[in-house]
Amino acid sequence: MLKAYKYRIYPDAEQMQFFAKCFGCVRFVYNRMLSDRIEHYNLTGKSLNNTPAQYKSEFTWLKEVDSLALANAQMNLNTAYRNFFRDKSNGFPKFKSKKNNNFSYTTNNQKGTVYVENGYIKLPKLKSPVKIGQHRSFEGVIKSCTISKAPSGKYHISILVETEIQKLPASDMRVGIDVGIKDFAVLSNGEAYKNPKHLRKSEKRLAKLQRDLSRKQIGSSNRNKARIKVAKLHEKIANQRMDFLHKKSTEIIRKNQAIVIEDLKVKNLMKNHNLAKSIAEVSWSRFREMLDYKSRWYGRELIIAPPDYPSSQLCSDCGNRSSQTKDLACRVYICPECGLEIDRDYNASLNLLKLTM
């Protein structure tokens, strides 16, 4: 099974320069190959199978970087292009912009070219190993790794490892999960996870830093310092959110053998401008992704409720259906048939739990 481990790395000046070259060359090759494919498609109506090797004679500086990074850029483009041919309504794949402050490239471990030793990681094409902050160890075979630079200026490496993951002992517990905005999640066992609202708590600080940034002269060192402060706060908020999602998803997976969650169409919900910001902050999709891969790792069953399953409209006691909860302001479900009065989210979680029966 494949599992990724992310660590902070601390490259020296020479290594930073090499990474910058790789980031730039990967972007260049991706964009050049995409441009040529679009031109070829417009002329012939067919796809062009070009490769990075074709450009090295014309652009000799491409030979200075990791060839596997360029090959992975081609693989990413191939995936994007296949998606284009499946659904042309979205248009051609997008070009990668220089203005994007998130940089990355992926390389592969071929015959031991990537390894960790004594607090350093060896990478292809680099003369010296890079210092790594390995806060936790891993076992298994390194398959690939992705080097990235965040807008804050920090460097990270995500190491993909083929490893054996120990299944958790079987549990007789099952749970239904209703996700929301007021409470991040309400569980059928009566637990409720409050929405931590990391972004909302940092909004004033973020607004001040963004005002400071807007007042700085474009291109000045002071503007760059201000930009980094904004980026670091965004990074902190993202890390807090990910930490919360990891802790809650792991807690649920450890306790329960079967988990049921709604099949929420987040893209459609985001069209509601009154709720879009709150929905983006709670990261339901990422939470579901975590439950998905962790359930596969640890031998649990994740059940996705059908899109048309009316979990919030059914009475969890008698099964009667009522449309009262279509009004989001309605927080208590009152069954017109049996008289049950219950919190709408808890009622929905109990209905989701029934899908494990």
Go through each PLM region and give its residues.
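Acidic carboxylate diad motif detector
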Residues: 50-150
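Positively charged, helix-rich recognition surfaces that bind polyanionic ligands
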Residues: 28, 138, 151-357
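Short, glycine- and charge-enriched coil/turn segments that flank and shape catalytic ligand pockets
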Residues: 40-50, 54, 88-89, 167-171, ...
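Long, hydrophobic, amphipathic alpha-helical segments used as structural scaffolds
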Residues: 34-41, 81, 85-92, 163
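Gly/serine-rich nucleotide phosphate-binding loop at the start of the catalytic core
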Residues: 1-70
